[in-house]
């Protein structure tokens, strides 16, 4: 036990005090067969310099490929200042700001974050974040069920174009809460929700409708028609959106005749790296009339007794603070550090910078699709407009193509066949603002070579 800071004399004195001969006597009740006999094949310890050299040698084995994968996690440029600021001790090691008078900096940052999310989504109030996009959507569904007092069925319509992992998360969370989830089919020519299937439920008791924009395939849904349908059917509408797209597209608060009721999504594109799947954060915003049913924490601005502006945890109807049965959520925390990075990211870029990022993503993906669909055996799978990722169809087995692309140093996309069997040999590709013309040209050239092998 070399990590224990006792000198040999300290150890001897303590052993004598308890009548033990040596340290091993402390473990004599453990059978010898269960005692540690030393790790096998573990080399002797090395010093720091040797360790750094070994780490460098191992790091050189990594392959830094060009990434064209999206599917819910996107490679964006993150200004160096974002994590330089977010890593300051005041943010990095701070705990939940329960003591408002000692946490004004953190509280103001969260308040500014909420304001920015409301500006992006066109809504009136935002919470201080959720775990990730999937849990944010699941919580939004639960919130919608609580809000819809007219509905007696707890039936929720979810577009089949919503991210498959998000739909799985919803099923997991609501399965035992007497909520029926109905998946709407999509048009296999257009790649968007089949409005005919939605209209079949007109006049029926439907509690909520979940819409994705852009959807999992990157396509742009007919959000105005779907939102208006929900309003006329007395159904709570929930929008699951990509925050980057909101710098270009109409905000959900303006969809249809009256806008949606709840907006949520994945915050990873706003300053969080693609760190093996997390940690990320989810955002959720709504109208002020619904604020009492919003999960998580909400930061408010107020004035103290001396007339000075201050910030505090205004609403936090969580199971930690009130009766569990009355809580709006049993999630006990949020993703404050990732929200800090997102707030800094949005502040640094500003509206114009966010718009430039979204525009470049859109342009790059269109250039990518144009280049790839000129290759024999490659075609665009759907006809609907798309934002910054799209589905292509190949005349060869997609897994073989992906492996050959990987061998050439290209992460070529995501194969959705595992979620949609009817989409065999299709590939979901994405090109954000970090992809260059040279990257796109390399992908197209490599894919052309791969596709030509079949006819050779």
UniProtKB/Swiss-Prot annotation:
Origin organism lineage: Bacteria, Pseudomonadati, Pseudomonadota, Gammaproteobacteria, Legionellales
Coiled-coil portions: none
UniProt keyword terms in alphabetical order: Oxidoreductase
Entry's Gene Ontology BP terms: glycine decarboxylation via glycine cleavage system; nucleoside metabolic process
EC id: 1.4.4.2
The protein's name in its UniProt record: Probable glycine dehydrogenase (decarboxylating) subunit 1
Subunit structure and binding partners: The glycine cleavage system is composed of four proteins: P, T, L and H. In this organism, the P 'protein' is a heterodimer of two subunits.
GO molecular function: glycine dehydrogenase (decarboxylating) activity
């Amino acid at each position: 036990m070399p990590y224990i800071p006792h000198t040999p004399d300290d150890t001897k004195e303590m052993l004598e005090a308890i009548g033990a001969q040596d340290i091993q006597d402390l473990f004599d009740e453990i059978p010898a067969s269960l005692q540690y006999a030393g790790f096998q094949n573990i080399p002797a310890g090395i010093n720091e310099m040797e360790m750094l050299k070994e780490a460098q040698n191992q790091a050189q084995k990594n392959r830094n490929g060009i990434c064209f994968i999206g599917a819910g996690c996107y490679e964006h440029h993150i200004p160096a200042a974002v994590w330089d600021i977010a890593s300051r001790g005041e943010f990095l090691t701070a705990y939940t700001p329960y003591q408002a008078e000692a946490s004004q900096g953190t509280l103001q940052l969260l308040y500014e974050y909420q304001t920015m999310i409301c500006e992006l989504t066109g809504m009136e109030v935002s919470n201080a974040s959720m775990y990730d996009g999937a849990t944010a959507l699941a919580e939004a569904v639960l919130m919608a069920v609580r809000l819809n007092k007219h509905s007696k069925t707890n039936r929720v319509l979810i577009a089949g174009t919503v991210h498959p992992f998000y739909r799985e998360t919803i099923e997991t969370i609501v399965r035992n809460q007497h909520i029926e989830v109905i998946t709407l089919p999509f048009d296999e020519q257009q790649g968007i929700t089949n409005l005919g299937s939605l209209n079949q439920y007109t006049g029926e008791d439907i509690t909520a409708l979940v819409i994705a924009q852009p959807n999992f395939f990157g396509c742009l849904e007919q959000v105005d028609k779907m939102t208006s349908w929900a309003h006329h059917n007395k159904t709570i509408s929930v929008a699951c959106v990509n925050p980057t797209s909101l710098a270009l597209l109409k905000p959900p608060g303006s969809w249809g005749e009256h806008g949606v009721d709840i907006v949520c999504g994945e915050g990873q594109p706003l300053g969080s790296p693609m760190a093996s799947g997390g940690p990320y954060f989810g955002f959720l915003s709504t109208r002020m009339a619904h604020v009492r049913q919003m999960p998580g924490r909400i930061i408010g601005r107020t004035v103290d007794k001396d007339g000075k502006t201050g910030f505090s945890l205004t609403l936090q109807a969580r199971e930690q603070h009130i009766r569990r049965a009355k809580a709006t959520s049993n999630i006990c925390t949020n993703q404050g550090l990732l929200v800090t990075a997102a707030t800094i990211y949005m502040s640094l870029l500003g509206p114009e910078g966010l718009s430039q990022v979204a525009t470049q993503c859109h342009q790059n993906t269109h250039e990518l699709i144009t280049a790839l669909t000129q290759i024999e055996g490659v075609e665009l799978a759907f006809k609907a407009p798309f934002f910054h990722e799209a589905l292509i169809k190949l005349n060869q087995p997609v897994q073989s193509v992906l492996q050959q692309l990987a061998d050439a140093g290209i992460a070529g996309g995501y194969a959705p066949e595992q979620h949609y069997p009817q989409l065999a040999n299709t590939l979901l590709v994405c090109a954000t603002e970090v992809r260059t013309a040279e990257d796109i040209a390399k992908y197209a050239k490599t894919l052309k070579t791969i596709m030509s092998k079949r006819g050779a």
